[in-house]
């Protein structure tokens, strides 16, 4: 995918997103979107001071905030070329479609959320997979 590189302000991670997408930072949370699509990708960054991240627990915690019943059997798991663990799940709530990703490597964690008021099509899923797979932790 041709794209632009986003590097977090604290230099913890970077990834590639489509060059025709725009970016906006709201309350220190970067958001990425195509101006003609009905959704937005937001990236939340965390680091544990002690011990490694338990991605499944972090994903479950995020889902529970939205009062969604968590079902671990519906979580997809994969690893990118950097050895970064990625968990993915999706849900619908109040006419919004959500894709949530927990991306971790040792003590570092990103929660990436894409939410849209329209159903997510195959093209968008592929774009999201490319973005998420391109994540590299820097520190």
Placement of each model-derived feature along the sequence:
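Short C-terminal domain-edge/linker segments immediately following a structured domain
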Residues: 36-38, 46-47, 53-55, 63-65, ...
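Signature of long, low-cysteine stretches enriched in small and polar/charged residues
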Residues: 60-108, 115-118, 129
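Short flexible/disordered coil segments
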Residues: 33-41, 87-92, 133-139
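Surface-exposed amphipathic alpha-helical segments
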Residues: 21, 112-139
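Generic beta-strand structural signal
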Residues: 23-25, 104-105, 137
């Amino acid at each position: 995918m041709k794209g632009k590189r986003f590097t977090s302000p604290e230099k913890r991670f970077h990834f590639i997103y489509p060059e025709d997408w725009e970016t906006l930072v709201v309350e220190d949370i970067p958001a990425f979107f195509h101006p003609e699509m009905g959704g937005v990708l937001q990236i939340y960054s965390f680091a544990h001071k002690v011990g490694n991240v338990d991605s499944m627990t972090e994903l479950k915690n995020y889902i529970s905030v939205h009062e969604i019943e968590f079902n671990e059997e519906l979580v997809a798991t994969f690893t990118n070329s950097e050895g970064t663990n990625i968990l993915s799940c999706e849900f619908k709530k109040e006419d919004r479609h959500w894709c949530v990703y927990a991306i971790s490597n040792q003590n570092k964690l990103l929660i990436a959320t894409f939410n849209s008021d329209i159903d997510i099509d195959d093209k968008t899923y592929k774009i999201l997979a490319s973005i998420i797979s391109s994540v590299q932790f820097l520190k």
